């Protein structure tokens, strides 16, 4: 399956469910308490992150999709912290604030990236929460996917009303289920239980075949569009009536913390489906996203640049010959990772040792090296009849095979000013013995605060000399 990055900016999603605040106390631990055999943590940092349904909405917004959230909180500082964090992330949130009801807070005491203790602050909701009929109908307008983020905390008690309201508008409903009764999700487009939650409903599955059989039966019993079972280190299994099971292996290189991994799965699914992706593609993207987020500490979101880079790595397109649109996206991702972009250009007709040394020196000026190559017509204008010896496709293929080179692109003009104006590299590098002001494009790069560097050429290394030697012999 070929993966590509969806247009998340045109994919509005509404999340309804249990919101909570994930609070972290970070500090050092160097002694045992004299009062009891427990470590003493000297707290030096307090960190708040949106959790539960709020983390789902945050993940959707981090991918660049418009995200709205409906939830229940208390009237306290934890609710204020949640609202401020979500507003800063661009999430439109509507909270039903209940007096004398604490906002759900999960407090984790951390030392040296290890969780020592978790303390939960929560009480059952005394009222009938989320009786927000008018608000839900209003927020459903223009929405392409509805997510029910159910943590079993009591905020969601009207699942069927929400599912039917969305279905009446033709809006897919995705649910992250909890509890021992999945019938409350009847008619949903997709539910995403983990293996433990799934087996709570259908019983233990001794093998994959039994999982598939029981999953297909559950689909029919509950009139579900699809079922995605997340299986930890065994990946994910997507089941649909009348379709073969789709098994995807886990993508995590190293599992550091699984907190919020389920939120990442359903948020990526929702954003991808809202962007028009088919379900198998959306599941593959969610699987890739989950593999990234479990390598982070605590409740965390995956950004669009992180997902795009993972897709490029998966498709083998993280490096190599790119078109302008692909190159600009790759540059955006690199800058999101604080990488310095270096640019150089030339004909590179017959690649020789001098070129290789020069390109290695150029790459050393930053983190990513772009090599812009004159196309065949411009080389002929610059070098005269009989040149180039090698076509532009072959020249770019050879350059792309060098370890020092990240991206290769061609340009039709004699000089690269037009390309420089669009790429805006941090460093422009040229080989030769002339001054910086003589470098073509130096004025453009210096104009936006970039750097221009001139590197010396390797002696007795020249494509022209090689061509003349071949002709004489």
Curated annotation (Swiss-Prot):
Homodimer. This is Bifunctional protein HldE. GO terms for molecular function: ATP binding; heptose 7-phosphate kinase activity; heptose-1-phosphate adenylyltransferase activity; phosphotransferase activity, alcohol group as acceptor. Pathway: Nucleotide-sugar biosynthesis; ADP-L-glycero-beta-D-manno-heptose biosynthesis; ADP-L-glycero-beta-D-manno-heptose from D-glycero-beta-D-manno-heptose 7-phosphate: step 1/4; Nucleotide-sugar biosynthesis; ADP-L-glycero-beta-D-manno-heptose biosynthesis; ADP-L-glycero-beta-D-manno-heptose from D-glycero-beta-D-manno-heptose 7-phosphate: step 3/4. Gene3D superfamilies: 3.40.1190.20, HUPs. Residues 343-473 are annotated as: Cytidylyltransferase. Its EC number is 2.7.1.167, 2.7.7.70. The keyword Transport does not apply. It comes from the Bacteria.
């Amino acid at each position: 399956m070929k993966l590509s990055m969806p247009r998340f900016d045109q994919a509005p999603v509404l999340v309804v469910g249990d919101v909570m605040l994930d609070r972290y106390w970070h500090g050092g631990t160097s002694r045992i308490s004299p009062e009891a055999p427990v470590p003493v943590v000297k707290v030096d940092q307090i960190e708040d992150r949106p959790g539960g349904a709020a983390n789902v909405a945050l993940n959707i917004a981090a991918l660049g999709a418009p995200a709205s959230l409906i939830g229940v909180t208390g009237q306290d500082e934890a609710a204020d912290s949640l609202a401020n964090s979500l507003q800063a992330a661009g999430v439109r949130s509507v909270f039903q604030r209940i007096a004398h009801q604490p906002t759900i807070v999960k407090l984790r005491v951390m030392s040296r990236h290890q969780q020592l203790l978790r303390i939960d602050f929560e009480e059952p909701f005394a009222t009938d929460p989320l009786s927000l009929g008018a608000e839900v109908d209003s927020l459903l307008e223009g929405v392409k996917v509805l997510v029910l983020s159910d943590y079993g905390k009591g905020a969601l008690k009207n699942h069927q009303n929400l599912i039917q309201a969305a279905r009446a508008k033709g809006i897919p409903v995705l649910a992250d289920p909890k509890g021992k009764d999945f019938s409350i999700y009847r008619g949903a487009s997709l539910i995403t239980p983990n293996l433990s939650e799934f087996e709570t409903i259908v019983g233990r599955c001794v093998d994959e075949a039994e999982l598939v059989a029981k999953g297909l039966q559950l689909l029919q019993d509950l009139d579900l569009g699809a079922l995605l079972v997340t299986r930890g280190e065994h990946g994910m299994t997507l089941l649909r009536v009348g379709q073969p099971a789709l098994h995807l292996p886990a993508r995590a290189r190293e599992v550091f913390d699984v907190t919020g991994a389920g939120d990442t799965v359903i948020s990526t699914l929702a954003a991808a489906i809202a962007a028009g992706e088919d379900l198998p593609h959306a599941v593959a993207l969610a699987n890739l996203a989950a593999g990234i987020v479990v390598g982070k500490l605590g409740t965390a979101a995956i950004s669009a640049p992180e997902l795009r880079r993972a897709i490029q790595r998966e498709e083998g397109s993280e490096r190599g010959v790119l078109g302008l649109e692909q190159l600009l996206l790759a540059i955006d991702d690199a800058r999101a990772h604080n990488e310095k972009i270096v640019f150089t250009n030339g004909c590179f007709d017959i690649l020789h040792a001098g070129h290789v040394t020069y390109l290695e020196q150029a790459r050393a000026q930053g983190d990513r090296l772009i090599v812009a190559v004159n196309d065949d017509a411009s080389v002929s204008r610059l070098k005269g009849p009989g040149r180039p010896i090698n076509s532009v496709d072959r020249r770019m293929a050879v350059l792309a095979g060098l370890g020092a080179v990240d991206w290769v692109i061609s340009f039709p003009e004699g000089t690269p000013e037009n390309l420089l104006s669009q790429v805006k590299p941090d460093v422009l590098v040229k080989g030769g013995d002339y001054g910086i002001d003589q470098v073509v494009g130096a004025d453009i790069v210096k104009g936006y605060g970039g750097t221009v560097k001139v590197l010396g050429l390797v002696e007795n290394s020249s494509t022209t000399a090689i061509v003349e030697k071949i002709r004489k012999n």
